[in-house]
Amino acid sequence: MAENAAHRVRIRYFAWVREKVGCESEDVELPANIETVADLVGWLKQRGPQYDEAFARPQIVRAALDKVHVKPTTALGATREIAFFPPVTGG
C-alpha cells in the first residue's frame, strides 16, 4: 500500500460475524497504517462494541481477500474486497 494513502475497500460479513456486526457489507476508507488482515481486525474492533464482540476471538474468524482465503498476516495490498466468516465445515 502506498505510504500515507488511504485505501477504500468493501468489507463483507457472513454468518454469525454478520449477525454480530449488524450488516452484510460496508464500504470503508482504511487508514494508511492498516497493512495486514490482523491490522484490519484490530481497527474494526475499535469501531464499536458490535465489532469488538464479532472479533473477540480473532483466531477463529476466517478472512478472504478478493475471494482468496488468507492468513491474518497477509498484506492487504490493493485488495478491493475483504470477507470475514466463521470456519467452514462440511463433508
Predicted regions and their residues:
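Ubiquitin-like/PB1-type beta-grasp interaction modules and other compact soluble beta-rich domains
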Residues: 1-90
